[in-house]
Structure formats: C-alpha cells, structure tokens
Amino acid sequence: MPEVERKSKITASRKLMLKSLMLAKAKECWEQEHEEREAEKVRYLSERIPTLQTRGLSLSALQDLCRELHAKVEVVDEERYDIEAKCLHNTREIKDLKLKVLDLRGKFKRPPLRRVRVSADAMLRALLGSKHKVSMDLRANLKSVKKEDTEKERPVEVGDWRKNVEAMSGMEGRKKMFDAAKSPTLQ
C-alpha cells in the first residue's frame, strides 16, 4: 500500500500569519526587557553614586571633595586589580588541570567491558538493599521435561543383511516398513 502524503492542517497563509505574529510578540518582549534593563541600570547607579553638589563650595572644599573621590577611585581600582588577578590565577589553574586530565586519559587504557550475568535475586538485592529478603526463583515454577532417548526406543537389529533385503523386497516389505514407522508413535 503506497504511503499517502500527509497534508498540513494549516494553510501556508495561516502559517505565515502565525509566524509574523510570533515574531512581533518576540520583538515586543525583547524591547520590554531592554527597557527594564535600562531602568534597572539607572536605579542601581542612582543608589550607588550620589549626586555631586559643587555649587556654592569654596576652593578648599572642592579640593577636599576631589581628594576623597580620588581615594575612592584608588580603592576601587585596587579591588578590581585583585579580582582580575584571582580570575587570571583561576583560569590558569583550570587550564593546567584540563591538560593534566588529557595527559591522564592518554596514559591509561580503558579495559574492555564484559557482560556480567546477574541473577534476579542479586538484582533485587542490589536495588532494595540487603535488609529486604526477596527471593525470585523463576526456575522453580517451570515444569521439568525429560529428554526422550530416541536411540533406546528403536532396537538395532544386527543380522545377515541378505535376509533383510529378501524380507523387504516387494510389497510385503513396504508394508512392514510402514507398520514399523507407525508403531513407535502408538506406544
């Protein structure tokens, strides 16, 4: 039976309209996020940086204000330098550790994995823990079947082969063979 091509349940114009609506919504969300980020940035800066009032200050007061600002800038620069040094140290350490891992991978060969036969009891013990005593011997429910020895059922006649040829010749011999083939199944 040839495969039937599945037709889309939505027409191409409807797909295009939905796609344009989704893009418009995504653009709107992106613009809103951008505005929120800008507002958060302005709010953060207004909290951290107080407004400077330089009007009406004397020359000595302005110089003191400049010295304070320079001291703050120096402290911030020192902190920034310390953080950059720590980051650089950490990145170097990470790079060295990655190289060590690559070296160790090359030195050791992974052993070939072998299948391990786990019994159902061992699996349950591993899953449930050693406290739970659950036995799941699935072989106990199976019936025992004895193999029949086909060689024992048919006695092998060893005798003169000429007698067998004479006895089996003609229609009488065919009847004997047919009866012999039927007899083991009836017993």
Curated annotation (Swiss-Prot):
This is Troponin I, slow skeletal muscle. GO terms for biological process: cardiac muscle contraction; skeletal muscle contraction; transition between fast and slow fiber; ventricular cardiac muscle tissue morphogenesis. It comes from Rattus norvegicus (Rat). Keywords: Acetylation, Actin-binding, Muscle protein, Phosphoprotein. The modification N-acetylproline is found at residue 2. GO terms for molecular function: actin binding. The lineage of its organism: Eukaryota, Metazoa, Chordata, Craniata, Vertebrata. The keyword Acetylation applies. Signal peptide: none annotated. Troponin I is the inhibitory subunit of troponin, the thin filament regulatory complex which confers calcium-sensitivity to striated muscle actomyosin ATPase activity. Residues 2-48 are annotated as: Involved in binding TNC.
